[in-house]
């Protein structure tokens, strides 16, 4: 990801305030509600039949935390996202057969969740930096597919 020093600072400063458990669960839940076809990858998580069921599904919330924990690790290696996410890219491509477009969708949802939680602090400049980061992470996760 090609970020300026100021953008890197904005991203890491805001990320230091993120409650990974709360926002991870919200981001993955929103993905599954807004894009219901993504639920097929999580059928083993139990009841995902309604938005309410998804929003209160403990396995969805726990996996959302896991996803954002990995995302946070990626933020420590912004200059090597492909290397950082190589194993996850391979897993999602070869074993889970996840459509790589879903990574982009989740990134978009994450930006919305960050904006909702941080309000005025999530300025247009911060949003622009995060848009670059989520695009870079989605690209890194899709790397094995190419």
UniProtKB/Swiss-Prot annotation:
The modification Phosphothreonine is found at residue 12. GO terms for biological process: hydrogen peroxide catabolic process. InterPro entries: Globin, Globin-like_sf, Globin/Proto, Hemoglobin_b, Hemoglobin_oxygen_transport. Keywords: Acetylation, Heme, Iron, Metal-binding, Oxygen transport, Phosphoprotein, S-nitrosylation, Transport. Disulfide bonds: none annotated. Heme b binds at residues 63, 92. GO terms for cellular component: blood microparticle; haptoglobin-hemoglobin complex; hemoglobin complex. Red blood cells. The modification N-acetylvaline is found at residue 1. One of its GO terms (molecular function) is hemoglobin alpha binding. Residues 2-146 form the Globin domain. The modification N6-acetyllysine is found at residues 59, 82, 144. SUPFAM superfamilies: Globin-like. The modification S-nitrosocysteine is found at residue 93. Gene3D superfamilies: Globins (1.10.490.10). Heterotetramer of two alpha chains and two beta chains. Belongs to the globin family. Involved in oxygen transport from the lung to the various peripheral tissues. This is Hemoglobin subunit beta. The lineage of its organism: Eukaryota, Metazoa, Chordata, Craniata, Vertebrata.
């Amino acid at each position: 990801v090609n970020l300026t020093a100021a953008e890197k600072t904005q991203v890491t400063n805001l990320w230091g305030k993120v409650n990974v458990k709360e926002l991870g669960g919200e981001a993955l839940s929103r993905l599954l509600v807004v894009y219901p076809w993504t639920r097929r990858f999580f059928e083993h998580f139990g009841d995902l039949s309604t938005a309410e069921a998804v929003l209160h599904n403990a396995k969805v919330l726990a996996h959302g935390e896991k996803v954002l924990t990995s995302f946070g690790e990626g933020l420590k290696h912004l200059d090597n996202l492909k290397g950082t996410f190589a194993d996850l890219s391979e897993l999602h491509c070869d074993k889970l057969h996840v459509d790589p477009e879903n990574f982009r969708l989740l990134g978009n949802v994450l930006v919305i969740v960050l904006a909702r939680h941080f309000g005025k602090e999530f300025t247009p400049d911060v949003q622009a930096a995060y848009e670059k980061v989520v695009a870079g992470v989605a690209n890194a996760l899709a790397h094995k597919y190419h």
